Regions:
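Conserved active-site segment immediately N-terminal to the catalytic lysine
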Residues: 111, 125-136
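PLP-dependent enzyme catalytic core of the Aspartate aminotransferase-like
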Residues: 271-301
């Protein structure tokens, strides 16, 4: 709460299990009233997963979607029903490489899945009523999920919520409703202490912006590569790009592997390449990839 600037503002921080995927279920259970409705923004695979889980609970309104464009942009022009019990969005989309740069002004409670960019940039986190994030991108190992919840929005759904899925139960038991994943929570604590020592979110944000700027500049400069998503929606966490000529793929793949890079193949549903630049990645690693891209350009001439 300290790092998010939410201390003393009526929020509780929970360390739960089940990954962010379980929150797809817990959010409607706790917030959608019987005969109520919820509004969702569909910006990618994880957003559509959350929508799927919400539908059995009641009317689930998809206010906008970029699915028909293969999620290459973040929809901007949409309205949120004023009678919705909450509005759900996904701040960063790992597979497609898009990121929300602004969030709608609404009187409806706002729920945000920040699994892949939590603690990466400064935001007014008090605009959100629930923030949830799987630990395994920017916070710690897989096994625990951070849920930050504004207490005043709970207890209004009128549902008989199973205890293990009830935020109020987890708050009353201080995240120990059942045996917590102690090692995952402990290592997350160490990561958050590391982040605080780097100047908090504002400190790491500068590093993340520098890393992303370095890679996107090369993607745009190098005639062998092209970016996949709308420029204004590019993610600082996940850069997606492709080769303009697939004839270079075998050479490029051999070059980046030889340079010690791993895991930049794009998701199987998208193809191409995806370079993930989470908080722990140093800018030197990004420079190695940029150098390989420049090398490929030279060898292709």
């Amino acid at each position: 709460l300290e790092l998010l600037g939410l201390e003393g503002k009526g929020y509780q921080a929970l360390f739960l299990q089940g990954g962010a995927s379980l929150e797809f279920l817990m959010v409607p259970y706790n917030l959608m009233k019987v005969d109520g409705k919820a509004a969702y923004l569909d910006t990618g695979t994880w957003a559509s997963g959350a929508i799927k889980e919400a539908k059995p609970f009641g009317e689930t309104v998809v206010v906008a979607s970029s699915k028909e464009s293969n999620y290459t942009f973040i929809p901007k022009d949409y309205s949120i029903p004023t009678d919705a019990n909450y509005f759900h969005c996904t701040s960063n989309n790992t597979i497609f490489g898009t990121q929300m740069k602004s969030f709608p002004e609404t009187n409806v409670p706002v729920v945000c899945d920040m699994s892949s960019d939590i603690f990466s940039r400064t935001l007014d986190f008090s605009k959100f009523d629930i923030i949830y994030a799987g630990a395994q991108k920017n916070m710690g190992p897989a096994g625990t999920t951070l849920v930050v919840v504004k207490e005043e929005i709970l207890g209004k759904s009128g549902r008989n919520i199973p205890g293990i899925l009830n935020y109020e139960q987890h708050i009353s038991k201080e995240s120990m409703y059942n045996t917590p994943p102690v090692f995952a929570v402990y290592t997350s604590l160490l990561t958050l202490q590391w982040l605080k020592n780097k100047g908090g979110i504002a400190g790491i944000e500068k590093e993340n912006e520098a890393k992303a700027a370095l890679l996107y500049a090369e993607i745009d400069r190098n005639p062998l590569f092209k970016g996949v998503v709308a420029t204004e929606d590019r993610s600082t966490m996940n850069a997606t790009f492709t080769l303009n000529n697939e004839a270079h793929q075998e050479t490029f793949d051999a070059m980046w592997k030889a340079a010690g890079i791993s895991g930049i193949n794009g998701h199987r549903s998208v193809g191409g390449y995806r370079a993930s630049m989470y908080n722990a990645l140093p800018i030197e690693s990004v420079q190695v990839l940029v150098d390989v891209m420049k090398e490929l350009e030279k060898s292709a001439q």
